[in-house]
Amino acid sequence: NFLIPGIMEQVERTGVHSGDSICVYPAQHLTQAEIDTMVDYTGRFARELHVTGLVNVQYAVSNGKVYVIEVNPRSSRTVPYISKVTGVPMVDLAVRCCLGEKLTDMGYGTGLHPNAPYVAVKVPVFSFEKLHGVDTQFGPEMKSTGEVLGIAPNFHDALLKGLIGAG
C-alpha cells in the first residue's frame, strides 16, 4: 500500500530548483488523467523500489504527457510543507510503517489522499540584498534561504499572503 498526501505544482519552469520555486497545493493546472498517471507511476516506483517510509517523486508535464524528473526514496524539505497543508503526519506514518504497521491499520487509505478544502502556496525567501556577490540567476542550484506559506480559500489570496509573508 502507498499513500500520496497531495500533489504540489511548481509554478516556475522545469530546471529551477524546487526550493526556489513557488509551489501550490493542490495542483491547479493538472488534468485528472495526468493526476491518475502520477498516482500510478508513484505506486509502481514505491513497489519496485520496495520503499517502506518516504519517497519524493518529481514530475514534469508537457502537452499532456507526464515525465519523471527524479525519484528520491528519502525525506525532503517538502515533507513538513505537505504534512502541514494536508494534515497527514507523514514522518509519524513513515516511522510506524518502518516498524511494521500498515497504513490501513492507522486509518489511512491508499493512493491519493483527498484534497484539502483550501489552497496553500509556498513562497521562497531570498536574501540577495544581504549576500553580496551571489549569483541571482535561477537554475538547478538552490538560492533561497527560507520559505513562507500562504493559505486561503483560493489561489489568488493564498499567493498574495505568501508574497506578503516573503517580503
Range-by-range predicted roles:
Residues 1-167:
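ATP-dependent carboxylate activation and anion-phosphoryl transfer catalytic cores
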